[in-house]
Amino acid sequence: MTTDTEINPESARPEAHGSLSVTVEFTGGLEMLFSNERKHSVTLPARLSDGGRPSISFLLEYLVKNVMKDERKELFMLEDNVRPGILVLINDADWELEGEEKYELQPADNIVFVSTLHGG
């Protein structure tokens, strides 16, 4: 099951460049923090108010504020990054190969978060 989530206007202001859709998946128990749904289709602005593209860092903040229904943010994030023990894949590649949280999202990217602490 896929959940479609539109951008909250208060999170970022879309520019005239349209929107950007990515697929986000949660496994290894993380889906419990996101309404027990593994796959989410997320629409973000293609350009942010500063003119840049949304990054994984922006996506993390967006997910916590707009998609995560569980109040236990600390199970997913530690400060401004994912918790240790959560593997992040960008289009099936380890995010460390792509620049981690600085990676700029592209149309149709598939971002997967796997908790290795829960059998991931």
From Swiss-Prot:
Its main location: cytoplasm. The keyword Repeat does not apply. One of its GO terms (biological process) is tRNA thio-modification. Pathway: tRNA modification; 5-methoxycarbonylmethyl-2-thiouridine-tRNA biosynthesis. GO terms for cellular component: cytosol. It holds the Pfam family Urm1. C-terminal thiocarboxylation occurs in 2 steps, it is first acyl-adenylated (-COAMP) via the hesA/moeB/thiF part of UBA4, then thiocarboxylated (-COSH) via the rhodanese domain of UBA4. There is a cross-link at residue 120 (Glycyl lysine isopeptide (Gly-Lys) (interchain with K-? in acceptor proteins)). It comes from the Eukaryota. The modification 1-thioglycine is found at residue 120. It is found in: Cytoplasm. The keyword Hydrolase does not apply. Keywords: Cytoplasm, Isopeptide bond, tRNA processing, Ubl conjugation pathway. Belongs to the URM1 family. Acts as a sulfur carrier required for 2-thiolation of mcm(5)S(2)U at tRNA wobble positions of cytosolic tRNA(Lys), tRNA(Glu) and tRNA(Gln). Serves as sulfur donor in tRNA 2-thiolation reaction by being thiocarboxylated (-COSH) at its C-terminus by the MOCS3 homolog UBA4. The sulfur is then transferred to tRNA to form 2-thiolation of mcm(5)S(2)U. Prior mcm(5) tRNA modification by the elongator complex is required for 2-thiolation. Also acts as a ubiquitin-like protein (UBL) that is covalently conjugated via an isopeptide bond to lysine residues of target proteins such as AHP1. HAMAP family: Urm1 (MF_03048). This is Ubiquitin-related modifier 1. It comes from Aspergillus oryzae (strain ATCC 42149 / RIB 40) (Yellow koji mold). The gene is urm1.
